[in-house]
Amino acid sequence: FEQLRPEIYLIADPLFWIVPEKRVQLFRTLAEKTAWPMSLFIPARALKNKEWQPMLAGNRNIRLCIYNTTPIEGVQGFCNWVFAKGWGVPRPHNVLIPSIAIGLRLPFKKIYLAGADHSWLPEITVTDDNVVLMHQKHFYDQNKSQAATVTQENLHSARLYTILYHMYVAFKSYFVLEAYARRLGK
């Protein structure tokens, strides 16, 4: 993080503001280590949780940019219009979807994705007790990650059909964003 010094940083996972340990780890680290101007994109619904906000308040380098995660579906032309207004995004199942959607609204000609590995299906297992485990490898913890239950926003374990449905939604969202990008000439 300190070597890359990103100008733009986006979070999407609600567990970052719901789970106290994750909240403290992320926001305290951002506040302590961000010594350059950075725009931090945070979903509007994160504003309901006030506990992370004081952690960032003392760092003038961090500019909060609030984005709308209202899931938009329908006729592509209507979706494009809503995306351009910033009133919503394709269903934001993962951080890539709002990142791409917001990136398309910024003055970039091209968006390059790095570390966006989606080999999810081979990473799913179901135990004899019908508990779904997923080995969610991220580029920053590939050697340390282990198979674990998938935690939903309500902090309960997700069922297999829910996980597979969310994968479907994510992949569909990528195609919606591709059509939007083509419409923008990007």
Region locations from a protein language model:
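Metal-ion/cofactor- or nucleotide/acyl-coenzyme-handling active-site neighborhoods
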Residues: 1-186
